[in-house]
Amino acid sequence: MQQLASFLSGTWQSGRGRSRLIHHAISGEALWEVTSEGLDMAAARQFAIEKGAPALRAMTFIERAAMLKAVAKHLLSEKERFYALSAQTGATRADSWVDIEGGIGTLFTYASLGSRELPDDTLWPEDELIPLSKEGGFAARHLLTSKSGVAVHINAFNFPCWGMLEKLAPTWLGGMPAIIKPATATAQLTQAMVKSIVDSGLVPEGAISLICGSAGDLLDHLDSQDVVTFTGSAATGQMLRVQPNIVAKSIPFTMEADSLNCCVLGEDVTPDQPEFALFIREVVREMTTKAGQKCTAIRRIIVPQALVNAVSDALVARLQKVVVGDPAQEGVKMGALVNAEQRADVQEKVNILLAAGCEIRLGGQADLSAAGAFFPPTLLYCPQPDETPAVHATEAFGPVATLMPAQNQRHALQLACAGGGSLAGTLVTADPQIARQFIADAARTHGRIQILNEESAKESTGHGSPLPQLVHGGPGRAGGGEELGGLRAVKHYMQRTAVQGSPTMLAAISKQWVRGAKVEEDRIHPFRKYFEELQPGDSLLTPRRTMTEADIVNFACLSGDHFYAHMDKIAAAESIFGERVVHGYFVLSAAAGLFVDAGVGPVIANYGLESLRFIEPVKPGDTIQVRLTCKRKTLKKQRSAEEKPTGVVEWAVEVFNQHQTPVALYSILTLVARQHGDFVD
């Protein structure tokens, strides 16, 4: 039997000594031996730090984003290899899609976020300038820099691809290498994907390592520049979190654990409403997808007391139609658990719930002697959920959920929160007031809550689907950690530092001009410069323009804006302005007339306007002038040879009056041509 090799220190290595076996979930056949005994974990970490970390830190965010996109495209081209291996885990094609293509999709999402929202630099200014002095000579910004260590990702068995990729994406975008430690039961699928990434040559040497087997003494060798993430059981995560070296060196530890997630039926819903059918469908889908082996799966079904039997009957009727078996056979809707060990664990947890007072409405007993690790869809009923703590603390990690009655909506809220912290929850209701109250009271114990009704159902991504744009994690039992959430996740792999100094020094450090920093003026209008020629701080001070009552009248007639402060002399005199004032949007238009270079040149288009603030009113007779300054530049990747190479330039605009008082502050974005393209076929 072949051993599943690890990829450490840039080479594929086999362990020695005691090994565990990976079995086929359907046939029970032994497929792989897994061991990492004898492998040098300290050397593996050092290799990642010496090779992978410097290479990734040297890349800009834009370059890292491009790397993510390239890896995603490569993995997508090889997806059928992964689907074939995924069948060994008992998953259906639909189950595997979530894991394989869902994981690859997360790479694409982070590639897009990085290219659109992060600077073309290795430093990430997190906020705008923070003034710290009266005259403006001393200020600060928070900057994010890549940690110099390695991210250790300890992952669960249920999503061997997505579980790795959803962590790799923000890790690499943040500039850190990763050591992946997958769960043994499905490590062959993770290994295949890692091998594909390594063989592609798309990532720097040392950017990714893989441990098939135990992590050994790896955690003992980490220091404060390293990061550890864990996905798995709450018990294991709590044990690792207090590992002496992690505690002693305050090593960041992010934990995402299984939880007793709930689905609540609002008291406004009756069996003849569309929401009732949606509720049944959502629960059944979450019970049977991946054979219930999801950390976000619905475990507790909370319904009004009067609807218990109606809900139970509807769930049983639908669950009885679920065909369980080998996913390779036509018509099979639910596959097996990952192995016989997991099947025995689910049976044990079901027995605990039964001993605590729950009743079987469907299923409940697996054939523990069968070769395939099948477990039937199981619906339990807990008649007294307030007196049965086991139902809020015992998770059968399979196609098992427990129905329980709520006396009223307040009681339903209490039961929803009784899980002690959950990754996800769903409320099915058509009543906005019920939804608001549920969020107000239950959100504090949940990482994500879906409000499902007829209006949202058609496009809903579902109760159990973590999305890369949204946070994934939860308080309490769910681990107290947070993954994904768009760019929030990237910050877990970076150090935030408050940097103080003069505005000019802060601008030089961040490569972004800030208000108060020195500017550079020359005889060439900034709009006549190509993207490569522009530098943050390049500036233009425009001629002046005096505003008149005729301007106000003409703009009002042209725009249709006859607001009294502009057109009614008497009403305006009694307003906070004391007299008629110029339209704010005319001030912007006049400002554009002052700073725009009208001829054909590198500036292609106005991309948008941001952060507009009107500081002081402009009155007839006031004279305005504009300072236009290049604030930051963002390269746009050229997607084809035919596409014009461009970049986005953000300009700081300050409009001030004859007293040098700012009257309007804002930023404009322009699409600017580049002199040279970068497309590579």
Curated annotation (Swiss-Prot):
Active site positions, chain numbering: E256, C295
One MF annotation (Gene Ontology) recorded for this entry: hydrolase activity, acting on acid carbon-carbon bonds, in ketonic substances
Positions of the UniProt region annotated as Disordered: 456-484
Database matches in InterPro entries: Ald_DH/histidinol_DH, Ald_DH_C, Ald_DH_N, Aldehyde_DH_dom, HotDog_dom_sf, MaoC-like_dom, PaaN-DH
SUPFAM superfamilies named in the record: ALDH-like, Thioesterase/thiol ester dehydrase-isomerase
Region Aldehyde dehydrogenase, annotated ranges: 1-333
Top-level taxon in the UniProt lineage: Bacteria
Record protein name field: Bifunctional protein PaaZ
The species this protein was found in: Escherichia coli (strain K12)
Lineage per the UniProt record: Bacteria, Pseudomonadati, Pseudomonadota, Gammaproteobacteria, Enterobacterales
